[in-house]
């Protein structure tokens, strides 16, 4: 079930962006993607929900030249990957530069597998409504963090993982296509 077309396109897009000589008028660089440039700025990749999954996938499977410039990947409540992706060296190389944020009752962000650390954020909503980033609580210096996800989140996560593990490949593919 991996890669899906969106993941392939995300990795290609990241390579295209990384090959550009300039990012929003970087000092000392031309504005054309074909112009020579002595300064290649660092890259930060981020996304929410499916976009978080795409950000992690793209950062993992883009070119090695692009990957070397990635300083961090932020996944905001995006699903993880199956064991095949998690074991790939491309994913492992980017994993230590990846942080996933999930609300305390996360469902989406706990789907499939994650090896990167995750930070639990307090949300003013309940249940699935916590997936909305605008419900996440912030303080002066950043997110209002909690120690762990709720027991309900862990229960739903274990139940979904067990259910998905019992599916054959075509059923999993149908589930991914439906999302």
Regions found by a protein language model. Give the residues of each.
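Gly/Ala-rich beta-loop-alpha elbow adjacent to hydrolase catalytic centers
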Residues: 47-51, 55
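Alpha/beta hydrolase fold serine-hydrolase catalytic domain that processes acyl esters and thioesters
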Residues: 1-21, 37-42, 63-179
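Ala/Thr-enriched low-complexity intrinsically disordered regions
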Residues: 26, 31-38
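Short glycine-enriched nucleophile-adjacent loop
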Residues: 55-64
